[in-house]
């Protein structure tokens, strides 16, 4: 059986090396950081310049769409987003999101309909922009069911489809769960799905490293 998915892409510079501590901590739970990301990737943004993902991988990204999958944006610079968005000025947030939308248009020839926030980090202005920039839905949060965000009385008319299940690296951190049985743990969590279903977030690099 083929599983359908929405692929959300980082479309700007790859600065993975700036989160080296986080990557190494995650590697203790499963695949090692070098096998998951490659040694060069662990140096991007520090000792090596971060490659432009959208420009370098445009054909690959279009191939995902051509294979029948929905696509969306994960942002411009995912590392900077996770570190700054909570306290960033509205102008910085808007610039990050607009650059991602513009690059998506360049690659796919149309506006993105889906938005996912890197690391599930967001803010009032970021939520506001999901509506202003015309996204059909976003998955910027974690929760139990779909909802329309309301922040200090301000309604954002872009529905959120929150991630309801733990990520693979989180499952690997649970007692008794390892690479060989994590699929069983995930299936057990979805045995009785809520009326609105589940949303599972999977990082492609981790999935490949665990194969």
Question: What kind of feature is each model-predicted range?
Answer:
Residues 1-114, 119-159, 182-200, 208-211:
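Catalytic alpha-helical scaffold of carbohydrate-active enzymes acting on polysaccharides/glycoconjugates
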Residues 170-172, 207-210:
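A generic structural signal for short coil/turn motifs at secondary-structure boundaries
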Residues 164, 201-205:
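Short, loop-centered acidic/histidine patches that primarily coordinate divalent metals
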């Amino acid at each position: 059986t083929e599983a359908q998915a929405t692929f959300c892409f980082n479309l700007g510079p790859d600065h993975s090396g700036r989160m080296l501590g986080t990557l190494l901590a995650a590697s203790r739970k499963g695949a090692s950081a070098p096998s998951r990301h490659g040694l060069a990737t662990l140096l991007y943004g520090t000792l090596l310049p971060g490659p432009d993902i959208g420009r370098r991988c445009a054909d690959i990204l279009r191939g995902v769409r051509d294979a029948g999958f929905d696509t969306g944006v994960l942002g411009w610079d995912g590392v900077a987003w996770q570190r700054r968005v909570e306290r960033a000025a509205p102008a910085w947030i808007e610039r990050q999101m607009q650059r991602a939308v513009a690059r998506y248009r360049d690659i796919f020839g149309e506006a993105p309909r889906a938005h996912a926030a890197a690391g599930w980090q967001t803010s009032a202005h970021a939520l506001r922009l999901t509506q202003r920039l015309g996204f059909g839905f976003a998955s910027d949060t974690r929760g139990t069911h779909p909802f329309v965000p309301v922040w200090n009385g301000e309604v954002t008319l872009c529905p959120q489809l929150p991630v309801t299940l733990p990520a693979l690296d989180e499952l690997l951190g649970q007692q008794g769960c390892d690479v060989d049985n994590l699929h069983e743990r995930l299936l057990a969590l979805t045995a009785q799905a809520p009326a609105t279903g589940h949303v599972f977030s999977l990082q492609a690099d981790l999935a490949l490293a665990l194969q």
